[in-house]
Amino acid sequence: GAPARADGVQAGLPDAAASLLTAESAAASAVNADLAPLGATAVTPLDRAHTQADLVAARGGDLTKARPYVGPRPGIVTRRGWGADESLRERNFAYTRTVKAAFVHHSATGNNYRCSQVPSVLRSIYRYHVKSSGWRDFGYNFAVDKCGNIYEGRAGGVAKAVLGAHTLGFNSNSMGIAVLGTFTSAGPPKAAVTAVAKLTAWKLGLFGANPRGKTYLKSGGGNLYRKGSNVRLNVISGHRDGFATECPGRLLYKKLGTARSVAARLQGR
């Protein structure tokens, strides 16, 4: 289906979320102030030329004459758009130095949801991460649904290097993207793979990363690499590349090559 418009997503919100902004809601929205008005339910897409111009301006114009390799900014449903209860998370935002890599996950939840139900799915995952796992906030930096919609995950600003909780040992200098569903025996929808490519083309591009490239991340300690080891990884990796796990499912993992190629093309490489 076509990506849900922000107002379509808004319709599924609880009454409380549609009320005036609380201090926590305002803070979660203000970190996206360069991209969307305060209280916006979505960040609107921007074409590649304007995305490049914004990036050059943000860096004070101190780039080489070459235009930056960055994909067009995709539309992103904000936390307000999916009805995140901002009182659940820790109040302060946590950041990391840069974004050198993206780890792709599956949420290991059901595949039979309707895209109009996604705000409710995200609220459940959020509550689980905070209440059951004891994390400071939603673990993933972004979520993607089967219709190709992209959602803001952990609060702190969609264009910023927000520290997530997604790949034990490699949360620093990376981002985590959860594709909603389970892709062990079912293939991911094409729209979801394309959305991963669009999101990474933009977000990795903001930090100068090539989606088809390799990078080094220092392990913080996990079940695959000992703490302190420098690990060479694809810039777009699966969860299993940094941690011994089935995630993101065999059939989504097989599509990461497609996501890398499309993302690089969207960056103009």
PLM features: what roles do these ranges have?
Residues R136-D137:
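Carboxylate/His-rich catalytic cores and anion/metal-binding grooves
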Residues P3-T96, A101-F103, S107, K146-A161, ...:
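Basic/polar, cationic surfaces and motifs that engage anionic cell-wall
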Residues L88, R97-S132:
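Active-site acidic/histidine clusters and adjacent loop/turn architecture
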